[in-house]
């Protein structure tokens, strides 16, 4: 395809932090730039001025700061409207779980502005939340480790009697710690509560080799594409830093 026939698109992407709990934005942008079918201009959307993806060569053509999800939908929409007035954004790709609800809520307003998104409904997002994962698995025939959602640290003792050790202590948005004792579980509870708030999810530990699969379906049960990946290097936040596709 010649350059003259390439479709020109301006795509805004979040998740530019590439630290020990990395966001997907940098990898998403690299994937977009590898596609030869489009003439792309990439707009980075960051929450902090020191996110590494802002300063990496060949990633974003221009970067704007946007408000944290806690600021609400109105603040986000106003900021995106300002960015759109300058950059004429065609597509926005949000990459964090914690920001998806706000982007879904403002989806119709973005569409009116001429900005496309490809997002689930609020109900679909809620159904695959960590808190609802076990019920989701039961409903759709997936084997999912048992879990308990707790709000009080005193509940760790009763849950440990049911699950046994080790257990996985998970934040409601991000991060997870494998606890081998009650003391380790309590420490993880306090740390995750301070960072992400309640509730905390306690999950049954499953031993074995972890394989992650990213899949694209047609919405009717047919898989269009699937890429399995095995993590080779894990950060202290439990995030994959290096891996191989299988």
Language model regions located:
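Short glycine-enriched loops at secondary-structure junctions
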Residues: 46-51, 97-99, 123, 219-223, ...
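General beta-strand structural signal in soluble alpha/beta enzymes
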Residues: 44, 93-94, 119, 146, ...
């Amino acid at each position: 395809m010649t350059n003259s026939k390439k479709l020109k698109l301006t795509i805004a992407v979040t998740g530019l932090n590439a630290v020990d709990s990395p966001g997907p934005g940098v990898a998403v942008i690299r994937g977009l730039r590898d596609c030869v079918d489009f003439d792309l201009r990439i707009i980075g959307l960051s929450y902090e001025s020191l996110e590494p993806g802002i300063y990496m060569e060949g990633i974003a053509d221009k970067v704007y700061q946007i408000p944290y999800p806690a600021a609400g939908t109105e603040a986000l929409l106003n900021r995106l409207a300002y960015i759109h007035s300058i950059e004429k954004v065609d597509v926005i790709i949000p990459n964090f779980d914690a920001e998806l609800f706000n982007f879904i809520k403002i989806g119709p307003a973005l569409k009116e502005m001429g900005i496309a998104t490809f997002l689930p409904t609020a109900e679909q997002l809620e159904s695959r939340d960590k808190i609802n994962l076990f019920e989701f698995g039961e409903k759709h025939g997936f084997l999912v480790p048992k879990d308990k959602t707790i709000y009080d640290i005193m509940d760790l003792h009763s849950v440990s009697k049911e699950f046994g050790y080790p257990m996985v202590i998970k934040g409601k948005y991000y991060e997870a710690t494998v606890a081998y004792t009650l003391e380790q579980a309590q420490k993880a509870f306090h740390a995750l509560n301070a960072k992400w708030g309640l509730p905390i999810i306690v999950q049954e530990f499953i031993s074995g080799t972890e394989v992650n699969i990213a899949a694209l379906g047609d919405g009717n049960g047919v898989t269009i594409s699937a890429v399995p990946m095995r993590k080779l290097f894990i950060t202290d936040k439990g995030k994959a830093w290096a891996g191989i596709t299988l």
